[in-house]
From Swiss-Prot:
UniProt keyword terms in alphabetical order: Cytoplasm, Initiation factor, Protein biosynthesis
Name of this protein: Translation initiation factor IF-3
Family matches, as PANTHER family: TRANSLATION INITIATION FACTOR IF-3, TRANSLATION INITIATION FACTOR IF-3, MITOCHONDRIAL
Source taxonomy: Bacteria, Pseudomonadati, Campylobacterota, Epsilonproteobacteria, Campylobacterales
Ranges that cross the membrane: none
First-listed, main subcellular location of the protein, grouped into a coarse class: cytoplasm
Superkingdom field: Bacteria
Listed GO MF terms: ribosome binding; translation initiation factor activity
Subunit structure: Monomer.
One BP term from GO: ribosome disassembly
Length: 172
């Protein structure tokens, strides 16, 4: 366990006086640590330090095992709800044949139907670097073919030797 996530409980708590709260919300007020430990032992629960920076530190009497289980459960739920965005990249060139464009656009539409984002990338070779507008024109041509099933997230942008365009699945 890392230092930041480490929770002090029972005898590990060093403060002499603590503000103690019960698991059911009962406020015991400011009492000595030993007295708080005695109460927690009587109830068969743990004394957990929840606010170490407060004056005096705040402790709660609770079942630590159950508390940790619930925290882990919350983290798993949060992780499940997170959605990872997968970006598929399709590479093109300025001198690509029409049937190859059709093939790559077909693949892109399959990716979009699966809910993936697609990045079209035109690589500029040699003299093509002097006219990057040809790469932009190529991406505009691709956009005309795919605009019915996608939203354009990024307009065609010239980035070094590449011209990039990002499309996302249509919402709704």
């Amino acid at each position: 366990m890392s230092k930041e996530n480490e929770v002090l409980l029972n005898e590990d708590i060093r403060a002499r006086e603590v503000r103690c709260v019960g698991d059911d919300g009962t406020a015991y007020g400011v009492i000595s640590r030993d007295e708080a430990l005695e109460i927690s032992n009587k109830l068969g629960l743990d004394l957990v330090l929840i606010a170490p920076d407060a004056k005096p530190p705040v402790c709660k009497i609770m079942d630590y095992g159950k508390f940790r289980y619930q925290q882990e459960k919350k983290q798993k739920e949060a992780k499940k709800k997170q959605k990872t965005i997968e970006i598929k990249e399709i590479k093109l060139s300025v001198k690509i044949a029409q049937n190859d464009i059709n093939y790559k656009v077909k693949h892109a539409s399959e990716f979009l139907q699966d809910g993936k984002h697609v990045k079209f990338r035109v690589f500029l070779k040699g003299r093509e670097m002097s006219t990057p507008e040809a790469g932009v024109a190529m991406l505009e041509k691709v956009w005309e073919m795919i605009k019915d099933e996608a939203d354009r997230d990024k307009e065609p942008i010239i980035e070094g030797r590449y011209v990039n365009m990002l499309v996302t699945p249509k919402k709704g």
